Amino acid sequence: MRLGVIADDFTGSVDIAGFLVAGGMRTIMCSRPVVVGDSDAIVMSLKIRSIPKSEAVKQVLEALAFLQQAGCDRFYYKYCSTFDSTSEGNIGPITDALREALNCSTTLICPALPVNGRTVFHGYLFVKDELLSDSPMRHHPLNPMHDSKLARILSSQSPAKNGHIYYDVIAKGSIAVRKAIEELKADGVNNIIVDVIDDEDLLVIAEATEDFSLVTGGSGLAQGIAHRWRERSGKAADLNAAFVVERRKAVVIAGSCSAMMQKQVAYYKKLAPSLSINEQACLDDPEYAKIVAAWVLEHQDQVLAPMVYATRSPSELEENRKKFGDADVSSAIEQMFSRLTGLLADKKVQNFIVGGGETSGVVATTLGVDAYLIGRQIDPGVSWVRSLDGAYQLVLKSGNFGSVEFLEKAQEMYDGNH
Protein backbone atom coordinates (compact mmCIF):
# COMPACT_ATOMS: atom_id res chain seq x y z
CA MET A 1 0.00 0.00 0.00
CA ARG A 2 1.08 3.54 -0.75
CA LEU A 3 -1.25 5.99 0.93
CA GLY A 4 -2.18 9.24 -0.79
CA VAL A 5 -3.60 11.93 1.48
CA ILE A 6 -5.39 15.07 0.31
CA ALA A 7 -5.59 17.57 3.17
CA ASP A 8 -7.76 20.67 3.05
CA ASP A 9 -5.33 23.05 4.76
CA PHE A 10 -1.66 23.34 5.72
CA THR A 11 -2.01 22.63 9.42
CA GLY A 12 -4.16 19.61 8.70
CA SER A 13 -1.42 18.30 6.45
CA VAL A 14 1.18 18.59 9.20
CA ASP A 15 -1.29 17.06 11.63
CA ILE A 16 -1.86 13.87 9.67
CA ALA A 17 1.74 13.62 8.42
CA GLY A 18 2.94 13.70 12.02
CA PHE A 19 0.68 10.81 12.99
CA LEU A 20 1.78 8.78 9.97
CA VAL A 21 5.46 9.35 10.78
CA ALA A 22 4.85 8.48 14.44
CA GLY A 23 3.22 5.28 13.22
CA GLY A 24 6.29 4.30 11.22
CA MET A 25 5.29 5.38 7.71
CA ARG A 26 7.88 7.28 5.71
CA THR A 27 5.94 10.38 4.74
CA ILE A 28 6.53 13.23 2.31
CA MET A 29 4.37 16.34 2.46
CA CYS A 30 4.05 18.66 -0.51
CA SER A 31 1.83 21.48 -1.74
CA ARG A 32 2.39 20.88 -5.46
CA PRO A 33 3.39 17.89 -7.58
CA VAL A 34 7.04 17.08 -6.88
CA VAL A 35 9.33 14.14 -7.46
CA VAL A 36 8.71 12.03 -4.40
CA GLY A 37 11.36 9.42 -3.59
CA ASP A 38 10.89 6.33 -1.54
CA SER A 39 7.95 6.77 0.81
CA ASP A 40 4.99 4.95 2.27
CA ALA A 41 2.67 7.95 2.24
CA ILE A 42 2.38 11.22 0.36
CA VAL A 43 0.40 14.08 1.90
CA MET A 44 -0.81 16.65 -0.62
CA SER A 45 -1.39 19.94 1.19
CA LEU A 46 -4.08 22.16 -0.30
CA LYS A 47 -5.86 25.29 0.91
CA ILE A 48 -9.44 24.47 0.00
CA ARG A 49 -11.44 24.50 3.21
CA SER A 50 -13.12 27.85 2.68
CA ILE A 51 -12.96 28.46 -1.08
CA PRO A 52 -15.81 28.03 -3.62
CA LYS A 53 -16.92 24.42 -4.08
CA SER A 54 -16.14 24.22 -7.79
CA GLU A 55 -12.56 25.40 -7.31
CA ALA A 56 -12.07 23.10 -4.31
CA VAL A 57 -13.24 20.07 -6.28
CA LYS A 58 -11.01 21.03 -9.23
CA GLN A 59 -7.92 21.22 -7.01
CA VAL A 60 -8.77 17.95 -5.27
CA LEU A 61 -9.12 16.05 -8.54
CA GLU A 62 -5.80 17.46 -9.76
CA ALA A 63 -4.19 16.33 -6.49
CA LEU A 64 -5.75 12.90 -6.89
CA ALA A 65 -4.30 12.57 -10.38
CA PHE A 66 -0.82 13.43 -9.07
CA LEU A 67 -1.10 10.91 -6.23
CA GLN A 68 -2.24 8.20 -8.62
CA GLN A 69 0.68 8.94 -10.94
CA ALA A 70 2.98 8.75 -7.90
CA GLY A 71 1.85 5.20 -7.27
CA CYS A 72 -0.69 5.68 -4.49
CA ASP A 73 -3.35 2.98 -4.38
CA ARG A 74 -5.33 4.04 -1.32
CA PHE A 75 -6.63 7.53 -0.59
CA TYR A 76 -7.53 9.63 2.44
CA TYR A 77 -9.37 12.96 2.30
CA LYS A 78 -8.32 14.76 5.47
CA TYR A 79 -10.42 17.57 6.97
CA CYS A 80 -10.52 19.11 10.42
CA SER A 81 -11.56 17.07 13.44
CA THR A 82 -14.09 19.82 14.18
CA PHE A 83 -15.61 19.29 10.71
CA ASP A 84 -15.22 22.97 9.79
CA SER A 85 -17.87 23.15 7.10
CA THR A 86 -21.20 24.97 7.00
CA SER A 87 -24.09 24.28 4.61
CA GLU A 88 -22.03 26.08 1.96
CA GLY A 89 -18.98 24.00 2.81
CA ASN A 90 -16.82 21.67 0.78
CA ILE A 91 -16.62 18.38 2.67
CA GLY A 92 -19.72 16.88 1.04
CA PRO A 93 -18.96 17.97 -2.55
CA ILE A 94 -15.31 16.90 -2.32
CA THR A 95 -16.24 13.51 -0.89
CA ASP A 96 -18.77 13.02 -3.71
CA ALA A 97 -16.18 13.96 -6.35
CA LEU A 98 -13.56 11.59 -4.93
CA ARG A 99 -16.02 8.70 -4.71
CA GLU A 100 -16.97 9.23 -8.33
CA ALA A 101 -13.38 9.59 -9.53
CA LEU A 102 -12.32 6.43 -7.71
CA ASN A 103 -15.47 4.56 -8.74
CA CYS A 104 -16.33 3.64 -5.16
CA SER A 105 -19.92 3.89 -4.01
CA THR A 106 -19.20 4.03 -0.28
CA THR A 107 -16.69 5.75 1.96
CA LEU A 108 -16.11 6.54 5.61
CA ILE A 109 -16.78 9.76 7.54
CA CYS A 110 -14.52 9.74 10.60
CA PRO A 111 -13.57 13.19 11.94
CA ALA A 112 -12.78 11.92 15.46
CA LEU A 113 -9.46 12.63 17.16
CA PRO A 114 -9.87 11.38 20.74
CA VAL A 115 -6.39 12.45 21.87
CA ASN A 116 -7.51 16.05 21.33
CA GLY A 117 -11.01 15.56 22.71
CA ARG A 118 -12.85 15.16 19.40
CA THR A 119 -15.22 12.20 19.67
CA VAL A 120 -18.39 11.05 17.89
CA PHE A 121 -21.34 9.43 19.64
CA HIS A 122 -24.61 8.52 17.89
CA GLY A 123 -23.42 10.61 14.98
CA TYR A 124 -22.94 13.77 17.05
CA LEU A 125 -19.50 15.40 17.14
CA PHE A 126 -18.17 16.46 20.53
CA VAL A 127 -15.30 18.74 21.50
CA LYS A 128 -14.27 17.37 24.87
CA ASP A 129 -17.45 17.47 26.98
CA GLU A 130 -19.41 19.81 24.71
CA LEU A 131 -21.37 19.30 21.53
CA LEU A 132 -19.56 20.91 18.62
CA SER A 133 -22.35 23.49 18.33
CA ASP A 134 -21.95 24.43 22.00
CA SER A 135 -18.16 24.66 21.82
CA PRO A 136 -16.13 27.76 20.90
CA MET A 137 -16.34 26.55 17.28
CA ARG A 138 -19.74 28.23 17.09
CA HIS A 139 -17.78 31.51 16.98
CA HIS A 140 -15.36 30.48 14.20
CA PRO A 141 -14.96 33.54 11.93
CA LEU A 142 -14.94 31.54 8.66
CA ASN A 143 -16.93 28.39 9.45
CA PRO A 144 -19.14 28.91 12.51
CA MET A 145 -20.47 25.52 13.55
CA HIS A 146 -24.10 25.62 14.69
CA ASP A 147 -24.93 21.93 14.28
CA SER A 148 -23.28 18.84 15.76
CA LYS A 149 -25.11 16.11 13.84
CA LEU A 150 -22.71 15.08 11.07
CA ALA A 151 -25.41 13.62 8.84
CA ARG A 152 -27.36 16.89 8.89
CA ILE A 153 -24.29 18.90 7.98
CA LEU A 154 -23.49 16.57 5.09
CA SER A 155 -27.10 16.51 3.89
CA SER A 156 -27.07 20.30 3.68
CA GLN A 157 -24.11 20.07 1.28
CA SER A 158 -24.73 16.96 -0.79
CA PRO A 159 -27.50 14.59 -1.98
CA ALA A 160 -25.40 11.55 -1.01
CA LYS A 161 -27.05 9.04 1.31
CA ASN A 162 -25.67 8.95 4.85
CA GLY A 163 -25.69 6.07 7.31
CA HIS A 164 -24.29 5.34 10.76
CA ILE A 165 -22.40 2.69 12.65
CA TYR A 166 -23.05 3.45 16.29
CA TYR A 167 -20.88 2.71 19.27
CA ASP A 168 -22.64 -0.50 20.31
CA VAL A 169 -21.45 -2.07 17.03
CA ILE A 170 -17.96 -0.54 17.17
CA ALA A 171 -17.50 -2.01 20.65
CA LYS A 172 -18.06 -5.53 19.27
CA GLY A 173 -14.98 -5.34 17.07
CA SER A 174 -13.97 -5.28 13.43
CA ILE A 175 -15.97 -8.31 12.30
CA ALA A 176 -19.20 -6.73 13.55
CA VAL A 177 -18.23 -3.44 11.92
CA ARG A 178 -17.57 -5.17 8.58
CA LYS A 179 -20.99 -6.81 8.73
CA ALA A 180 -22.62 -3.43 9.43
CA ILE A 181 -20.71 -1.90 6.51
CA GLU A 182 -21.99 -4.56 4.11
CA GLU A 183 -25.57 -3.96 5.28
CA LEU A 184 -25.21 -0.21 4.76
CA LYS A 185 -23.67 -0.72 1.31
CA ALA A 186 -26.59 -2.98 0.36
CA ASP A 187 -28.94 -0.19 1.45
CA GLY A 188 -27.22 2.25 -0.93
CA VAL A 189 -25.44 4.31 1.73
CA ASN A 190 -22.63 6.48 0.34
CA ASN A 191 -21.20 7.99 3.52
CA ILE A 192 -20.79 5.82 6.63
CA ILE A 193 -20.49 7.96 9.76
CA VAL A 194 -18.75 6.07 12.57
CA ASP A 195 -18.88 6.60 16.33
CA VAL A 196 -15.46 6.91 18.00
CA ILE A 197 -14.83 7.32 21.72
CA ASP A 198 -11.15 6.38 22.05
CA ASP A 199 -8.10 5.31 20.07
CA GLU A 200 -9.05 1.64 20.34
CA ASP A 201 -12.15 2.40 18.28
CA LEU A 202 -9.94 3.85 15.56
CA LEU A 203 -7.94 0.61 15.41
CA VAL A 204 -11.17 -1.37 15.04
CA ILE A 205 -12.42 0.91 12.26
CA ALA A 206 -9.06 0.89 10.45
CA GLU A 207 -9.06 -2.92 10.44
CA ALA A 208 -12.68 -3.12 9.28
CA THR A 209 -12.14 -0.72 6.37
CA GLU A 210 -8.80 -1.94 4.99
CA ASP A 211 -10.44 -2.72 1.66
CA PHE A 212 -11.80 0.84 1.26
CA SER A 213 -10.00 2.64 -1.57
CA LEU A 214 -11.15 5.96 -0.07
CA VAL A 215 -11.61 7.04 3.53
CA THR A 216 -12.27 10.53 4.86
CA GLY A 217 -11.77 12.06 8.26
CA GLY A 218 -9.62 13.93 10.71
CA SER A 219 -6.13 12.73 11.50
CA GLY A 220 -7.26 10.22 14.13
CA LEU A 221 -7.96 7.43 11.66
CA ALA A 222 -4.39 7.81 10.36
CA GLN A 223 -3.17 6.36 13.66
CA GLY A 224 -5.23 3.25 13.02
CA ILE A 225 -4.15 2.97 9.39
CA ALA A 226 -0.46 3.36 10.33
CA HIS A 227 -0.88 0.77 13.08
CA ARG A 228 -2.38 -1.74 10.65
CA TRP A 229 0.30 -0.94 8.06
CA ARG A 230 2.99 -1.57 10.68
CA GLU A 231 1.43 -4.90 11.67
CA ARG A 232 1.23 -6.04 8.06
CA SER A 233 4.70 -4.82 7.05
CA GLY A 234 6.47 -5.88 10.24
CA LYS A 235 8.26 -2.52 10.41
CA ALA A 236 8.89 -0.47 13.55
CA ALA A 237 8.33 3.27 13.89
CA ASP A 238 11.21 5.07 12.17
CA LEU A 239 12.28 7.86 14.50
CA ASN A 240 15.17 8.62 12.15
CA ALA A 241 12.57 10.23 9.89
CA ALA A 242 12.67 13.18 12.27
CA PHE A 243 15.35 15.89 12.27
CA VAL A 244 17.02 18.04 14.91
CA VAL A 245 15.43 21.49 15.10
CA GLU A 246 18.11 24.19 15.07
CA ARG A 247 17.94 27.47 16.98
CA ARG A 248 17.78 30.31 14.44
CA LYS A 249 16.24 33.76 14.12
CA ALA A 250 12.57 33.18 14.84
CA VAL A 251 9.09 34.67 15.07
CA VAL A 252 5.75 33.52 16.44
CA ILE A 253 2.76 34.55 14.31
CA ALA A 254 -0.69 33.91 15.80
CA GLY A 255 -3.60 34.42 13.43
CA SER A 256 -6.21 32.09 14.88
CA CYS A 257 -8.99 33.30 17.17
CA SER A 258 -9.79 29.85 18.59
CA ALA A 259 -10.30 29.39 22.31
CA MET A 260 -7.05 27.45 22.71
CA MET A 261 -5.07 29.97 20.67
CA GLN A 262 -6.36 32.70 22.98
CA LYS A 263 -5.03 30.77 25.99
CA GLN A 264 -1.70 30.10 24.27
CA VAL A 265 -1.26 33.75 23.34
CA ALA A 266 -2.16 34.90 26.86
CA TYR A 267 0.37 32.46 28.35
CA TYR A 268 3.15 33.35 25.92
CA LYS A 269 2.68 37.11 26.37
CA LYS A 270 4.00 36.66 29.91
CA LEU A 271 7.21 35.08 28.64
CA ALA A 272 8.25 36.92 25.48
CA PRO A 273 7.87 40.26 23.66
CA SER A 274 4.47 40.49 21.99
CA LEU A 275 2.77 42.85 19.55
CA SER A 276 -0.96 42.99 18.90
CA ILE A 277 -1.79 43.67 15.26
CA ASN A 278 -3.56 46.95 14.47
CA GLU A 279 -6.48 46.07 12.18
CA GLN A 280 -6.94 49.64 10.96
CA ALA A 281 -3.30 49.80 9.91
CA CYS A 282 -3.66 46.49 8.06
CA LEU A 283 -6.52 48.01 6.07
CA ASP A 284 -5.02 51.45 5.46
CA ASP A 285 -1.23 51.46 5.73
CA PRO A 286 0.75 49.59 3.04
CA GLU A 287 3.92 50.25 5.07
CA TYR A 288 2.57 48.67 8.24
CA ALA A 289 4.29 45.32 7.60
CA LYS A 290 7.66 47.11 7.57
CA ILE A 291 6.92 48.59 10.99
CA VAL A 292 6.00 45.17 12.38
CA ALA A 293 9.06 43.53 10.78
CA ALA A 294 11.35 46.13 12.34
CA TRP A 295 9.82 45.38 15.75
CA VAL A 296 10.37 41.63 15.31
CA LEU A 297 14.00 42.13 14.30
CA GLU A 298 14.61 44.41 17.29
CA HIS A 299 13.61 41.57 19.63
CA GLN A 300 15.81 38.76 18.34
CA ASP A 301 18.06 38.89 21.42
CA GLN A 302 15.51 37.16 23.66
CA VAL A 303 15.53 33.47 24.64
CA LEU A 304 12.03 33.06 23.23
CA ALA A 305 10.94 34.43 19.86
CA PRO A 306 8.86 37.63 19.69
CA MET A 307 5.17 37.12 18.95
CA VAL A 308 2.95 39.03 16.55
CA TYR A 309 -0.72 38.21 17.04
CA ALA A 310 -4.15 38.96 15.63
CA THR A 311 -5.88 36.62 18.09
CA ARG A 312 -9.10 38.13 19.43
CA SER A 313 -11.87 37.09 21.81
CA PRO A 314 -15.46 36.66 20.52
CA SER A 315 -16.42 40.03 22.01
CA GLU A 316 -13.45 41.73 20.34
CA LEU A 317 -14.36 40.12 17.03
CA GLU A 318 -17.90 41.43 17.38
CA GLU A 319 -16.57 44.92 18.13
CA ASN A 320 -14.44 44.71 14.98
CA ARG A 321 -17.47 43.73 12.90
CA LYS A 322 -19.29 46.81 14.14
CA LYS A 323 -16.26 49.05 13.71
CA PHE A 324 -15.15 47.93 10.25
CA GLY A 325 -18.48 46.94 8.71
CA ASP A 326 -18.10 45.22 5.36
CA ALA A 327 -14.33 45.69 5.21
CA ASP A 328 -12.52 42.37 4.79
CA VAL A 329 -10.37 42.61 7.88
CA SER A 330 -9.33 38.94 7.80
CA SER A 331 -8.01 39.31 4.26
CA ALA A 332 -6.15 42.51 5.16
CA ILE A 333 -4.49 40.79 8.12
CA GLU A 334 -3.47 37.83 5.96
CA GLN A 335 -1.99 40.15 3.35
CA MET A 336 -0.03 41.93 6.06
CA PHE A 337 1.21 38.60 7.45
CA SER A 338 2.33 37.64 3.95
CA ARG A 339 4.30 40.86 3.50
CA LEU A 340 5.72 40.47 7.02
CA THR A 341 6.87 36.93 6.28
CA GLY A 342 8.65 38.03 3.13
CA LEU A 343 10.38 40.91 4.89
CA LEU A 344 11.55 38.70 7.75
CA ALA A 345 12.80 35.99 5.40
CA ASP A 346 14.86 38.64 3.60
CA LYS A 347 16.48 39.39 6.97
CA LYS A 348 17.35 35.72 7.56
CA VAL A 349 14.54 34.84 9.94
CA GLN A 350 14.28 31.09 9.31
CA ASN A 351 12.08 29.69 12.10
CA PHE A 352 8.38 30.49 11.84
CA ILE A 353 6.00 29.25 14.55
CA VAL A 354 2.50 29.87 13.23
CA GLY A 355 -0.91 29.44 14.86
CA GLY A 356 -3.97 29.12 12.62
CA GLY A 357 -4.69 27.15 9.46
CA GLU A 358 -5.27 30.13 7.17
CA THR A 359 -2.25 32.00 8.55
CA SER A 360 -0.04 28.92 8.21
CA GLY A 361 -1.03 28.64 4.58
CA VAL A 362 -0.12 32.27 3.98
CA VAL A 363 3.30 31.90 5.62
CA ALA A 364 4.20 28.67 3.81
CA THR A 365 3.06 30.05 0.45
CA THR A 366 4.98 33.29 0.91
CA LEU A 367 8.16 31.39 1.76
CA GLY A 368 7.70 29.26 -1.34
CA VAL A 369 7.97 26.06 0.65
CA ASP A 370 6.22 23.28 -1.23
CA ALA A 371 7.75 20.08 0.16
CA TYR A 372 8.67 19.16 3.71
CA LEU A 373 10.45 16.74 5.98
CA ILE A 374 8.26 15.90 8.97
CA GLY A 375 9.85 16.08 12.42
CA ARG A 376 8.80 14.82 15.82
CA GLN A 377 5.50 15.91 17.28
CA ILE A 378 5.45 18.80 19.74
CA ASP A 379 1.93 17.99 20.87
CA PRO A 380 -0.53 15.54 19.29
CA GLY A 381 -1.25 16.70 15.76
CA VAL A 382 1.54 19.30 15.55
CA SER A 383 5.13 18.67 14.43
CA TRP A 384 8.10 20.74 13.45
CA VAL A 385 8.63 20.57 9.67
CA ARG A 386 11.62 21.56 7.59
CA SER A 387 11.72 22.61 3.95
CA LEU A 388 13.53 20.01 1.85
CA ASP A 389 16.34 22.47 1.15
CA GLY A 390 16.77 23.10 4.90
CA ALA A 391 16.22 26.85 4.59
CA TYR A 392 13.18 27.07 6.85
CA GLN A 393 11.90 25.31 9.95
CA LEU A 394 8.20 25.73 10.53
CA VAL A 395 5.48 24.97 13.02
CA LEU A 396 2.13 25.13 11.23
CA LYS A 397 -0.49 24.71 13.93
CA SER A 398 -4.25 24.51 13.80
CA GLY A 399 -5.55 27.15 16.17
CA ASN A 400 -7.31 24.67 18.42
CA PHE A 401 -4.38 22.26 18.77
CA GLY A 402 -1.64 22.11 21.36
CA SER A 403 -1.34 22.66 25.09
CA VAL A 404 -1.47 26.09 26.73
CA GLU A 405 2.35 26.09 26.88
CA PHE A 406 2.69 25.02 23.24
CA LEU A 407 4.50 28.09 21.86
CA GLU A 408 7.16 27.78 24.55
CA LYS A 409 7.34 23.99 24.27
CA ALA A 410 8.05 24.16 20.53
CA GLN A 411 11.19 26.21 21.19
CA GLU A 412 12.33 23.92 24.00
CA MET A 413 12.91 21.28 21.29
CA TYR A 414 15.80 23.25 19.76
CA ASP A 415 19.10 21.41 19.31
CA GLY A 416 17.71 17.97 20.06
CA ASN A 417 16.04 18.75 23.38
CA HIS A 418 12.68 17.10 24.11
PLM-predicted stretches and their roles:
Residues 1-38, 58-62, 112-115:
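N-terminal basic/disordered segments at the start of proteins
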Residues 128-295:
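Conserved, well-structured core segments that form the ligand-binding/active-site neighborhood
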Residues 2-7, 42-50, 73-84, 195, ...:
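Short glycine-rich or small-residue beta-strand-to-loop segments that form or flank ligand, phosphate
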Residues 16-18, 87-91, 118-126, 176-177, ...:
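Short acidic, glycine/serine/threonine-rich loops at helix termini
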Residues 349, 358-406:
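Conserved, well-ordered active-site substructure
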Residues 39-48, 301-304, 386-418:
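A structural-propensity feature for long, helix-poor, extended segments
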Residues 1-4, 30, 56, 64-74, ...:
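Cap/lid and interdomain-hinge subdomains that line or gate substrate/regulatory clefts
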Residues 296-355:
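C-terminal structural cap/anchor segments
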